[in-house]
Design a protein with these regions (language model features):
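Glycine-rich phosphate-binding loop at the start of an alpha helix
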Residues: 24, 74-78, 102, 171
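Short beta-strand-to-loop acidic/aromatic patch adjacent to the donor-nucleotide binding site
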Residues: 87-97
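Residue-level signal for inorganic ion chemistry
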Residues: 14, 23, 80, 93-94, ...
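Conserved core of the sugar-phosphate nucleotidyltransferase
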Residues: 99-185
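Short phosphate-binding loop-to-helix
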Residues: 56-89
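A structural signal for isolated positions on well-ordered beta-strands in alpha/beta enzyme cores
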Residues: 38-40, 65, 185
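Hydrophobic/aromatic residues located in beta-strands of well-ordered beta-sheets
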Residues: 39-41, 90, 117-118
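N-terminal glycine-rich phosphate-binding loop and ensuing alpha1 helix
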Residues: 1-49
Length: 185
């Protein structure tokens, strides 16, 4: 992300929460979950030198590899997948979501190991409406969930899904995998 909606000149992943850079806090959460986990970070090419400088300035020691981000999330993930060894289990997470808890990560990995994939979801508490040119009506929110990250997949499923051409309807990795014909858990 670039921080455009936040009207920040600094990309949001480089902002601080409680004196810690957001992306570093996010990475620390995953590193604490599993210190042997390979961490791949997709960043726009123009931000890589900033990241390297921040890591040096902050004495950030968590091992990770950088991959070049793409035009969209789809392209960023597709670029990163070239570094995935198969078979493995892959978690895709938004670097600006540092408050994910260990239990959510654990459940997602366990479910993906058992079923091939897992996405965390939460209930919607707000009212939901469908609005089109011909209708504007309330819909039962019990049928809808908010999708979060990390989204976790067995590597063969994710690698196969990303062989597809880009579709602007892809909003996350689950939508890419689902479009390839795989049921999402």
């Amino acid at each position: 992300g670039t921080g455009t909606r936040m009207e920040s000149r600094l990309p949001k992943q480089f902002l601080r929460i409680r004196h810690e850079i957001i992306l570093m806090k996010t990475m620390r959460t995953f590193h604490e979950f599993d210190k042997s986990m390979d961490l791949l970070i997709g960043l726009p090419a123009g931000e890589m030198s900033t990241w390297k400088r921040l890591c040096k300035d902050e004495n950030f020691q968590i091992p990770h590899r950088l991959t070049e981000g793409g035009e969209t999330r789809f392209h960023t993930i597709k670029n990163a997948l070239q570094y995935i060894s198969s078979p493995s289990v892959v978690a895709v997470h938004d670097g600006v979501r540092p408050l994910v808890d260990q239990q959510t990560i654990q459940r997602a990995f366990e479910k993906a190991e058992a079923t091939g994939n897992a996405i965390p979801v939460t209930d919607i508490h707000e009212s939901v409406r469908i609005v089109t040119a011909s209708e504007n009506k309330a819909v039962p929110r019990k049928y809808y969930k908010l999708v979060q990250t990390p989204q976790v997949f067995k590597s063969d499923i994710l690698l196969d899904a990303y062989e597809q051409e880009y579709n602007p309807d892809f909003t996350d990795d689950a939508s890419v995998v689902e479009k390839s014909g795989v049921f999402i858990h």
